[in-house]
Each structure stands twice: as structure tokens, then as C-alpha cells.
Amino acid sequence: GAYHSLGLKSNGSIVAWGRNNYSQCTVPSPNSAFIAVAAGAYHSLGLKSNGSIVAWGRNNYSQCTVPSPNSAFIAVAAGAYHSLGLKSNGSIVAWGSNDYGQCTVPSPNSGFTAVAAGVSHSLGLREE
């Protein structure tokens, strides 16, 4: 993140450290069954083994408000004030700040195999 870091332990728990002014380092309970993490500027994301995303920290652009249905995610990424989730069907869900179009997923929203995010941009890798 901007001033915080996340680590995923082999037991599925998250370790967070650094600046905690928006509780971005306060991992919600239960801190278990995580398979991936991503750090935004002042928010954090954790992907659970059941395919749901847990988000916490600053929510000024709704970057921590995971859209429904919160299921079938296989990867996460976090920009400064936006979040991305890759679904098992190859589609991308994006939420939070869209000031620069970073949450506007190009059409067709399918065939993606990976996601990544920068400060104010998003990336999706297609299998083609």
C-alpha cells in the first residue's frame, strides 16, 4: 500500500504492518483461510479460499464495498482507491474510484486469466 504492507502466511492468516490510520492493518476476524492479499493506498483486500473477498481500511470511494455476489473470485488486486476481483468465469469485477476509467472493464468482459492494478489504472490479462 502507500504506507502499509501485507503478508500471507502458509496457515492462511494475514500479517499487516505499517501506517494504520484507516485500520488498513487491522485484519478482520476470523484471520484465516486467506489465499491471496492486495494492498491499496489505504485499504486492504484478502481473498478467502471459498472465493469471497474481505476488504477493510479507508472506504472513501467504496473501494472496500465488495459488489454482490461476493463469490467465485480467484484473484484480487488493489489500486490507490479502487479494487479488482477476477471471477472463475474469466470476468473482472471492479469497484471504487473510477476517476480515470480504472473501473471500466473493456468489452468483452471475459477470457481474463489475471488482474493487476496501479495507482489509477487496471490491467487484465486475457488467454488469447
What are these regions (language model features)?
Residues A2, A33, G40-A41, A72, ...:
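Beta-rich catalytic cores
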Residues A116-E128:
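Blade-level signature of beta-propeller repeat domains, shared across WD40, Kelch, NHL, RCC1
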Residues H4-G7, A16, H43-G46, A55, ...:
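Conserved core positions of repeat-based scaffolds
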Residues N11, N50, N89, E127-E128:
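Acidic/polar residues in short coil/turn loops that connect beta-strands
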Residues L8, G18-P30, G57-P69, L86, ...:
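Short glycine/serine- and acidic-residue-enriched loop/turn motifs that recur at repeat junctions
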Residues A16-G18, V37, A55-G57, V76, ...:
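Short, hydrophobic beta-strand segments that form beta-sheet elements in well-ordered domains
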